[in-house]
Amino acid sequence: MSTSTQITKPYSTRALTHQSQTARRLLKLMSDKRTNLCASLDVTTSAELLSLADKLGPYICMVKTHVDIISDFTYDETVVKLVALAKKHGFMIFEDRKFADIGNTVKNQYSKGVYRIVEWADITNAHSVPGEGIINGLREAANEYVESEKAKGGECENLDRGLIMLAELSSKGSLATGSYTTKTVELAHNNSDFVFGFIAQNRMEEVQDSEGNYEDWLILTPGVGLDDKGDGLGQQYRTVDTVIKNGSDVIIVGRGLFGKGRDPVVEGKRYRDAGWKAYEERIN
């Protein structure tokens, strides 16, 4: 188990002190709703996405999307309706975009084009390969969006945006290990106003700030399964108990919730309960 100073703290306690507004919002939601389950909805039609989000909504803290695989995507029929479901059920939206280009390019990818991700995704993620410029570009887009919305004088609730860095992946043979992971943590440390966590298999080594306090990184872990070991395409599954005990804060589950022969409501409850039980055992 990780020796992290954060690992035994309740989500509600961490929500009071976290350096990121987006992370504070997520931690409070998780505590209030008693769930650390993120539903990874890798489906290819808007109808599938919205149906699953509605069925799983009561049991999750977050929906993870790959919006660019939606074959019939339109902003009004896909995004607007997904955001409405997020409000209905009380979950956040994480667009798993995995940005990986220079700062100016990712700024435009995040804010413009067909998807306009910054307008609706509370959270997105990025590779650290391009260096710090990728974080700066995404942060600029987020800040410009927030300022433009405030200038309109409309609803300003939940405008904050947060970034997660890809520190480790769950696929077999992943190159995101060792020095890559270490450098990714360094980048996050230098940009903790915007970066609040990692996609990782284990808890990241913590860094003390100038006042001697340890930074609090949220760890989101994919490749979690209660039944399967893998998928034949390199995905490797680990148990809920294992990832939570190793310091993960959010378990990301996809096909385990809605794969062939699975009832999303039944599986949503099962994974929610398993994740919460493992978390309570960790903090007690």
Swiss-Prot record:
The keyword Protein biosynthesis does not apply. It comes from Magnusiomyces magnusii. GO terms for biological process: 'de novo' pyrimidine nucleobase biosynthetic process; 'de novo' UMP biosynthetic process. GO terms for molecular function: orotidine-5'-phosphate decarboxylase activity. GO terms for cellular component: cytosol. Pfam families: OMPdecase. Belongs to the OMP decarboxylase family. Substrate binds at residues 42, 64-66, 96-105, 237, 255. Keywords: Decarboxylase, Lyase, Pyrimidine biosynthesis. This is Orotidine 5'-phosphate decarboxylase. It is an enzyme of class 4 (lyase). Pathway: Pyrimidine metabolism; UMP biosynthesis via de novo pathway; UMP from orotate: step 2/2. Its EC number is 4.1.1.23. The gene is URA3. It catalyses: orotidine 5'-phosphate + H(+) = UMP + CO2. The keyword Lyase applies. The active site is at residue 98.
